[in-house]
Amino acid sequence: MNAKDVISRLPDEVLGRILSLISTKEAVSTSVLSKRWKNMFVLVSNLDIDDRQSVPKTKQNRIEIHRNYMAFVDKLLDTQRGSSIKKLTLKSHVGVRGGTDSSRIQSWICNVLDHGVMDLDVFITLKGKSPPVPAMIFKSKTLVKLRVGRGFTIKLSQDVSLPLLRTLCLDSVNFVGGHNVVGTLISRCPVLEELVVEERRCVDWTCSVSSPSLKRLHIRFDRKFTSISLDAPNLIYYKHSGYVLGKYPNVKLDSLIEARLNLRMDETRMVGVRNGSLGSIPADMRNLINGIRNVRILHLSSHTLELLYFSCKEMPLFDSLVSLSIGNDKARGWQMLPLLIKNSPNLETLIFMGLDHYITNRCGDVCVCYDTDESITSCLSSSQVKVLEILSYQGTTRELNQMKHFLEKLPCLELVKICVVNNSNNLQTTMEMRNLMMLPRASSKCKIQVKVLTKNN
């Protein structure tokens, strides 16, 4: 008995699971093997249909690929009638203008909803008029995970209800029916645990996210939005990127463990604020910062750190903060860093993605941009930081002076981890490492670890 016969004699349920481990296209192709395999692929409950496997070279190719793609989906879903579909991933990236029949997309979605689908991922790059998401998608009693993008229109009916939905991702969709469509949708998801909203289309948009079950939240705005309020008492992970909003009226994230803020504003306006030609930034971040004050792990991009300086004159006490990482950008300053370190009495780990930053006399005593009065007690001297990590270390004189400042001022340091970028000059790299090892240290327990990375890494 050969290996093929052994596999063919396995129970249908086992064969269905095996076929679920390969791509849907490959699973369908097994139907030509023998009569035994002719309709075996209908046992596959996880369908993954993606046109990226075919790379179009010309417009004609794109049109043909798109037609074949739609015909394949039609045929596949037609053969699945009566079968269980647990997961459908439907992706098309060809983006032929006028080539996608929105009614067919809607029929595909309705088809799998009728099959009791639990995990639905529809990501189709559309050109032209945005088709609406079928209303029944927001009334599903079986959906546990839902991702919709890109270019669809969402309009909610009064009877929206997703009782089992735990993960929701909305990527570049159009919202119709008021400013707080997202908030309304979330309120109809009683067990929602993870929410991702990436919005690049709407302008003058406001949102209020209130959910006692939400644990993870990622929001990204690439346009100028108005405001967002957040009330998620059990949220443990929060990521906020894109444009900073004008207002954060209410932010309550009392259980937060980790936060990542990567916010920016128009560069022209930022330059004006920095040089004094503009009075202030059109954003009030005070409620946002107060709302995350219980966080334990905080990641701030260099843009965010500078925005905080121009938006917040005061900083709350971060009693629970144990790890802080700062982004790297030579065009952004560290003006807010002294106050942030001072107001983090239990900070143990301080991470810099790089030491390059905008030279200013407002960085206080945390850096060596300008000579500081030695009689002034540094915020570093009272810090409890035990681990200092520096990434992308280039070994410049300015960086070496900054490292000297850190080592002389941080009294509780136990470990310094430095990632040196190798410039292909082994002798220079060796000298950089030697210079680092010879620096004086305020802490007798301080050890320095140096890791050398080549630029290819």
Swiss-Prot record:
LRR repeats lie at residues 265-288, 292-315, 318-343. Residues 4-50 form the F-box domain. SMART domains: FBD (SM00579). The keyword Repeat applies. Keywords: Leucine-rich repeat, Repeat. It comes from Arabidopsis thaliana (Mouse-ear cress). This is F-box/LRR-repeat protein At2g42730. Coiled coil: none annotated. InterPro entries: F-box-like_dom_sf (IPR036047), F-box_AtFBL13-like (IPR053781), F-box_dom (IPR001810), FBD (IPR006566), FBL60-like (IPR055294), LRR_FXL15/At3g58940/PEG3-like (IPR055411).
